[in-house]
Amino acid sequence: MTVAEIRARNLSIPAPSQITRPALAGEKETMVLNMGPHHPSTHGVLRLVVELDGETVVDVAPDIGFLHTGIEKTMESKTYQKAVVLTDRTDYLAPLSNNLSYVLAVEKLLGCEVPERATVARVLLVELQRIASHLVWLGTHALDLAAMSVFLYGFREREQILDIFELVSGARMMTSYFRVGGLAYDLPAGFDAAVEAFLQIMPGRIDEYEALLTDNPLWIERTQGIGAIDSEAAIALGLTGPGLRATGVAWDLRKTMPYCGYETYSFAIPTATHGDIYDRYLVRMAEMRESVSICRQALQRLRDIGPGPYMTSDRKIAPPPKSEITQSMEALIHHFKLWTEGFKPPRGDALAAVESPRGELATYIVSDGSAKPYRVHFRAPSFVNLQSLPHMARGHLVADLVALIASLDPVLGEVDR
């Protein structure tokens, strides 16, 4: 795609029509370069058309769509329960957050009650997912700025979280563990001990990361004062998540629009004031500490609740227990029809939003009364947050683009869908 075509898609970006152009009266000559779509710092398949005056960024045009998979359209041909597996593959670094947003929207359509044990388990697992996602961000962000040790340390702890996910669901990343009405399976033996072991070591590990970076003069030089954005511009651009909270706006859906009983948990919303790369780093580091605290509270609640149902008792939604399937022909028929034909929510629409590691993630579903959704749309935070990149990049060096992209933490599977 040419620069002119990209400019036509976004008229706010004044890109020149040629690779180089003569300087007009009173301005300097600029040059247009492609960054990506195969550049390692773009954290996926992202192309940036960068207009430069020397090494100074005049403007940036993100060119997306290289990872488009048609997930939203594909979901229209799946039953509601089968479509869960597709939600894993949008933001593939936080699949449980996508599972949660989707199943909450379907449960709204159905008016479904979820057992308390399943709700608490959802909170615990999505907070572990938040930590795992932030560890990927921290490691790759540090690696982009030549801090390799942090990358290795962060992935060390992420492995422990992925081991927990594997214990629970059998999969390390594409878990598909949340189901409409509850969970796919009950929490296994050894889950409590595995989570407790991780929560014991994680605060000390965060201290290690901060000791390596927070007061590091090279890290400060590459992040402080770079890519700053104020709260007014952030809100106007639709920025959410750590990027918005780094501007001083304490907006977190877990507090402002609670779901899954988050209003009953004790945690703070970390904020900063300058809105630059360094503040976005500080906010995410503080968020990991808060997530550890939420996990501790949720784990204690699971202990207090004890064994119990993990799926709704509504047999129009939930499959019969396996013990019944082996004894009852009616249960076997019901199981077969539920997975082949699916349940049928009433006509209507529903929206469910959650606070994913990258910001506000919402799922909007339209039901026509059939067993398959008429329309599914994701409000993907990576997609919306990416439009703030030109605003943050103007006036900085081209080398700062690498750090800027990392500070937004985009996942291109979620951007392109």
Swiss-Prot record:
Keywords: Cell membrane, Membrane, NAD, Quinone, Translocase, Transport, Ubiquinone. It comes from the Bacteria. It is an enzyme of class 7 (translocase). Coiled coil: none annotated. Signal peptide: none annotated. It is found in: Cell membrane. The keyword Nucleus does not apply. It catalyses: a quinone + NADH + 5 H(+)(in) = a quinol + NAD(+) + 4 H(+)(out). It is a peripheral membrane protein. SUPFAM superfamilies: HydB/Nqo4-like (SSF56762). Pfam families: Complex1_49kDa. One of its GO terms (molecular function) is NAD binding. Belongs to the complex I 49 kDa subunit family. PANTHER family: NADH DEHYDROGENASE [UBIQUINONE] IRON-SULFUR PROTEIN 2, MITOCHONDRIAL (PTHR11993:SF10), NADH-UBIQUINONE OXIDOREDUCTASE 49 KDA SUBUNIT (PTHR11993). This is NADH-quinone oxidoreductase subunit D 2.
